[in-house]
Amino acid sequence: MRCSRRVLDRVFTGLVPVALGVLLSGCSSVSYYGQLAEGQWQLLRARQPLDRVIESPATSPVLRQRLLFAEKARAFASAQLKLPDNGSYRVYADLGRPYVVWNVFATPELSLQPVTHCFPIAGCVAYRGYYRQGAARGAAALMRQEGLDVYVGGVEAYSTLGWFDDPILSTMAGWGDERLATVIFHELAHQRVYVQDDTEFNESFASFVEQEGTRQWRAARGLAAIDEVGARQREQFTRLVLASRERL
């Protein structure tokens, strides 16, 4: 039986102090892990069932239509693409800000090899995420003082890899219907298969599921496939960038 969001919230509340105690026992990054826990908790508390938001008189017509479309794409993802059939993307959260998190990326000066950071669930990734833009900029400034090249980028969506029921976020609501569907496919693919410490494989797998899922989703609605020439050009550009990185 699928756990309710209320149960997951209680579990999260109980586990956070224990998890933080373990994580911080030999680590000085108390504030960083604290803001991660607080930010995720606030996001979970903001969730509402899609049906409730769709039926609410306070919901704008544009948002209502977008969520109705998302409902259909979400059902297709599990029924036809065999992606996880759970509560993710069947709830909505209004965050009141343009991005859900801001990621800080860093490389040694004149290098294309990213500095990685390791976490218990996600494994090692090439960024650190912050729920407040000011905190991200502050962390970036400290990294620059260490001689690193740094970039701060806003993120409109992310996946908890099935640990919680991920919502459709207000940060995603401005997207076109097609992009919203592809992101649902992409993020659910991460829940289906995720290999720790292998960002390249994880993104390649999720991107493949996204592209194939989009093709099938469009075909099911009687729409033509997305321009294959454009897709090939994007793939060629990606290979060129990766080859350039190897040479450098």
Q: Where are each of the predicted segments found?
A:
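Bacterial N-terminal signal peptides that target proteins for export
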Residues: 3-16
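Acidic/His-rich structured neighborhood in mature extracellular/periplasmic domains
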Residues: 73-234
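Short, conserved catalytic or interaction motifs in soluble domains
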Residues: 29
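C-terminal amphipathic alpha-helical segment
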Residues: 230-248
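Short amphipathic alpha-helical coiled-coil/interface segments
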Residues: 63-75, 241, 245
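C-terminal motif of bacterial Sec signal peptides marking the signal peptidase cleavage site
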Residues: 25-26
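Post-signal peptide N-terminal segment of mature Sec-exported envelope proteins
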Residues: 32-62
